[in-house]
Protein backbone atom coordinates (compact mmCIF):
# COMPACT_ATOMS: atom_id res chain seq x y z
CA UNK A 1 0.00 0.00 0.00
CA UNK A 2 2.96 2.33 0.38
CA UNK A 3 3.42 2.13 -3.39
CA UNK A 4 -0.26 2.66 -4.19
CA UNK A 5 -1.03 5.43 -1.69
CA UNK A 6 0.09 9.05 -1.70
CA UNK A 7 -0.68 9.42 2.01
CA UNK A 8 0.19 6.49 4.26
CA UNK A 9 0.01 6.03 8.03
CA UNK A 10 1.10 2.97 10.01
CA UNK A 11 0.34 2.79 13.74
CA UNK A 12 1.87 -0.15 15.60
CA UNK A 13 3.63 -1.06 18.83
CA UNK A 14 7.28 -2.09 19.19
CA UNK A 15 8.33 -5.11 17.21
CA UNK A 16 5.64 -4.85 14.54
CA UNK A 17 7.92 -4.00 11.66
CA UNK A 18 7.61 -0.24 11.23
CA UNK A 19 11.31 0.34 10.61
CA UNK A 20 11.81 -2.89 8.64
CA UNK A 21 8.88 -2.30 6.28
CA UNK A 22 9.64 1.36 5.67
CA UNK A 23 13.32 0.64 5.00
CA UNK A 24 12.30 -2.10 2.56
CA UNK A 25 9.91 0.28 0.80
CA UNK A 26 12.63 2.92 0.51
CA UNK A 27 15.06 0.45 -1.09
CA UNK A 28 12.51 -0.93 -3.56
CA UNK A 29 11.26 2.52 -4.49
CA UNK A 30 14.75 3.90 -5.06
CA UNK A 31 15.76 0.96 -7.26
CA UNK A 32 12.60 0.78 -9.38
CA UNK A 33 12.05 4.54 -9.72
CA UNK A 34 15.32 6.25 -10.75
CA UNK A 35 16.15 9.67 -9.29
CA UNK A 36 13.77 9.20 -6.36
CA UNK A 37 14.51 11.54 -3.45
CA UNK A 38 13.48 10.33 0.01
CA UNK A 39 13.84 12.41 3.17
CA UNK A 40 13.54 10.65 6.53
CA UNK A 41 12.75 12.69 9.63
CA UNK A 42 12.01 12.00 13.28
CA UNK A 43 12.12 13.81 16.60
CA UNK A 44 15.83 12.94 16.83
CA UNK A 45 18.37 12.19 14.12
CA UNK A 46 19.28 8.99 15.99
CA UNK A 47 15.73 7.70 15.57
CA UNK A 48 15.64 8.70 11.89
CA UNK A 49 19.00 6.99 11.31
CA UNK A 50 17.42 3.66 12.29
CA UNK A 51 15.76 3.41 8.87
CA UNK A 52 19.08 3.83 7.06
CA UNK A 53 20.90 1.53 9.50
CA UNK A 54 18.34 -1.17 8.75
CA UNK A 55 19.48 -0.95 5.11
CA UNK A 56 23.24 -0.72 5.70
CA UNK A 57 23.57 -3.10 8.68
CA UNK A 58 20.84 -5.63 7.83
CA UNK A 59 19.66 -5.65 4.22
CA UNK A 60 23.16 -5.18 2.77
CA UNK A 61 24.75 -7.90 4.94
CA UNK A 62 22.39 -10.63 6.09
CA UNK A 63 20.59 -11.91 3.00
CA UNK A 64 23.18 -13.72 0.89
CA UNK A 65 22.81 -13.10 -2.84
CA UNK A 66 20.02 -10.62 -2.11
CA UNK A 67 22.47 -8.49 -0.17
CA UNK A 68 25.01 -8.85 -2.99
CA UNK A 69 22.47 -7.53 -5.49
CA UNK A 70 21.54 -4.64 -3.20
CA UNK A 71 25.17 -3.63 -2.71
CA UNK A 72 25.54 -3.44 -6.49
CA UNK A 73 22.68 -0.93 -6.62
CA UNK A 74 24.15 1.30 -3.89
CA UNK A 75 27.16 3.49 -4.62
CA UNK A 76 27.63 5.37 -1.34
CA UNK A 77 26.53 5.09 2.30
CA UNK A 78 27.23 7.27 5.31
CA UNK A 79 25.20 7.00 8.50
CA UNK A 80 26.47 9.25 11.28
CA UNK A 81 25.31 11.85 13.75
CA UNK A 82 25.76 14.77 11.37
CA UNK A 83 25.29 13.15 7.97
CA UNK A 84 23.18 10.16 6.98
CA UNK A 85 22.66 9.34 3.31
CA UNK A 86 22.43 6.36 0.96
CA UNK A 87 23.00 6.96 -2.76
CA UNK A 88 21.99 4.61 -5.57
CA UNK A 89 23.59 4.06 -8.97
CA UNK A 90 20.46 5.29 -10.78
CA UNK A 91 20.48 8.70 -9.10
CA UNK A 92 18.08 7.92 -6.25
CA UNK A 93 18.96 8.75 -2.66
CA UNK A 94 17.69 8.48 0.90
CA UNK A 95 18.81 10.96 3.52
CA UNK A 96 18.01 11.98 7.08
CA UNK A 97 16.88 15.55 7.67
CA UNK A 98 16.50 17.51 10.89
CA UNK A 99 12.91 17.94 12.07
CA UNK A 100 13.31 21.59 13.03
CA UNK A 101 13.58 25.04 11.49
CA UNK A 102 17.24 24.35 10.73
CA UNK A 103 16.17 21.58 8.35
CA UNK A 104 14.64 23.95 5.81
CA UNK A 105 15.82 23.81 2.22
CA UNK A 106 15.72 20.09 1.47
CA UNK A 107 13.70 18.72 -1.45
CA UNK A 108 12.09 15.30 -1.75
CA UNK A 109 9.57 13.21 -3.65
CA UNK A 110 8.81 11.10 -0.58
CA UNK A 111 8.68 12.31 3.01
CA UNK A 112 8.93 9.64 5.70
CA UNK A 113 8.37 10.69 9.32
CA UNK A 114 9.18 8.02 11.90
CA UNK A 115 7.50 8.33 15.33
CA UNK A 116 5.68 11.33 13.93
CA UNK A 117 3.71 11.88 17.16
CA UNK A 118 6.96 13.11 18.76
CA UNK A 119 7.53 15.74 16.06
CA UNK A 120 5.91 19.14 16.49
CA UNK A 121 2.88 19.50 14.21
CA UNK A 122 3.88 23.02 13.21
CA UNK A 123 7.30 21.71 12.15
CA UNK A 124 5.66 19.03 10.01
CA UNK A 125 3.39 21.52 8.26
CA UNK A 126 5.76 24.47 7.86
CA UNK A 127 9.11 22.74 7.36
CA UNK A 128 8.93 19.04 6.47
CA UNK A 129 5.93 18.99 4.13
CA UNK A 130 7.44 21.94 2.23
CA UNK A 131 10.13 19.55 1.00
CA UNK A 132 7.57 18.03 -1.36
CA UNK A 133 7.71 20.65 -4.09
CA UNK A 134 8.45 19.19 -7.52
CA UNK A 135 7.51 15.57 -8.29
CA UNK A 136 9.98 13.12 -9.79
CA UNK A 137 10.71 13.83 -13.46
CA UNK A 138 11.17 10.47 -15.24
CA UNK A 139 12.33 10.57 -18.86
CA UNK A 140 9.01 9.28 -20.20
CA UNK A 141 7.48 12.70 -19.45
CA UNK A 142 9.50 14.05 -22.40
CA UNK A 143 7.28 11.99 -24.70
CA UNK A 144 4.06 13.97 -25.39
CA UNK A 145 2.14 10.70 -25.36
CA UNK A 146 2.91 10.23 -21.65
CA UNK A 147 3.35 13.82 -20.52
CA UNK A 148 0.10 13.70 -18.54
CA UNK A 149 1.31 10.82 -16.34
CA UNK A 150 2.83 12.97 -13.62
CA UNK A 151 3.66 11.25 -10.35
CA UNK A 152 2.38 12.52 -7.02
CA UNK A 153 4.72 13.01 -4.10
CA UNK A 154 4.16 10.82 -1.05
CA UNK A 155 3.87 11.33 2.70
CA UNK A 156 4.44 8.37 5.03
CA UNK A 157 3.85 8.54 8.78
CA UNK A 158 4.92 5.83 11.25
CA UNK A 159 4.33 5.78 14.98
CA UNK A 160 3.15 3.88 17.99
CA UNK A 161 -0.33 4.92 19.11
CA UNK A 162 -0.73 7.75 21.60
CA UNK A 163 -3.40 9.57 23.62
CA UNK A 164 -6.67 10.68 22.05
CA UNK A 165 -5.99 14.22 23.27
CA UNK A 166 -2.88 14.43 21.07
CA UNK A 167 -2.97 15.97 17.58
CA UNK A 168 -1.81 12.67 16.06
CA UNK A 169 -5.20 11.13 16.90
CA UNK A 170 -6.98 13.83 14.90
CA UNK A 171 -4.63 13.19 11.98
CA UNK A 172 -5.34 9.46 12.19
CA UNK A 173 -9.09 10.12 12.13
CA UNK A 174 -8.69 12.36 9.09
CA UNK A 175 -6.74 9.62 7.31
CA UNK A 176 -9.50 7.14 8.15
CA UNK A 177 -12.15 9.40 6.61
CA UNK A 178 -10.05 9.93 3.48
CA UNK A 179 -9.34 6.19 3.22
CA UNK A 180 -13.06 5.66 2.67
CA UNK A 181 -13.07 8.18 -0.19
CA UNK A 182 -12.27 6.28 -3.39
CA UNK A 183 -11.14 9.48 -5.11
CA UNK A 184 -8.25 9.95 -2.65
CA UNK A 185 -5.17 7.77 -2.27
CA UNK A 186 -5.03 7.51 1.52
CA UNK A 187 -4.22 4.45 3.61
CA UNK A 188 -4.05 3.91 7.36
CA UNK A 189 -3.29 0.73 9.26
CA UNK A 190 -3.37 0.33 13.04
CA UNK A 191 -2.25 -2.89 14.71
CA UNK A 192 -3.10 -3.70 18.36
CA UNK A 193 -0.25 -3.97 20.86
CA UNK A 194 -1.54 -7.44 21.81
CA UNK A 195 0.14 -8.78 18.66
CA UNK A 196 3.56 -7.85 20.06
CA UNK A 197 2.69 -9.44 23.41
CA UNK A 198 1.47 -12.67 21.82
CA UNK A 199 4.66 -12.96 19.75
CA UNK A 200 6.88 -12.08 22.77
CA UNK A 201 8.09 -8.88 21.13
CA UNK A 202 7.23 -6.60 24.06
Feature map (PLM): residue ranges:
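Phosphate/NTP-binding elements of NTP-utilizing enzymes
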Residues: 1-202
Amino acid sequence: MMMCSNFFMYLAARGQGKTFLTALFCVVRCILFPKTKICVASATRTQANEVLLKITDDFMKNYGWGSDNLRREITYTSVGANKAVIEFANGSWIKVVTASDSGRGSRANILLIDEFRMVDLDTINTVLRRFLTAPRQPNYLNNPKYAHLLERNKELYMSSAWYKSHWSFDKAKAYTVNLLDETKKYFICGLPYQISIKENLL
